[in-house]
Amino acid sequence: MNGKRYELSILPLFEDDLNEIVDYITYRLKNPAAAERLVDDVEAAIIERLTCAESFEPYHSARERQYPYYRIQVRNFTVFYVVIGNTMEVRRILYSRRNWKDHI
C-alpha cells in the first residue's frame, strides 16, 4: 500500500439502493438479522477499500465516463464507486446478477 487514505463520499443514490435491499431482506424475506449483517459487511468493505481505492481494475462501463468505475464485491452485491482526486465516491450497490447496463 502507498499509505494514502481517501476521503469518503456516499451519494444518496447508493443510500437509496442499500435501503431498498435492506427493506427487501427485512420485510420480504423476513430476515432482519441478515440485513443487518449485510450492512455491516458493506460498511467494512468500503472502509477497507479507502486505503487502496485505485489499486483494482476499473470496470469498463458501456457509457463514456469522466471517472472510471471500480467495484467491490460483497456477498451477492456489487458496490460501484469512482475516485475523484482524493475522494472515493460510492455511487451504487446492485444485486450482482442484475443487468447493470441500464444502471451503470
Regions found by a protein language model. Name each.
Residues 52-85:
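Basic/aromatic recognition patch in beta-strand/loop cores that engages polyanionic ligands
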Residues 29, 74-78, 82-104:
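Enriched for short, Lys/Arg-rich terminal
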Residues 24, 45, 67, 87-88, ...:
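General helical secondary-structure elements
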Residues 1-65:
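Basic, Lys/Arg-enriched alpha-helical interface segments
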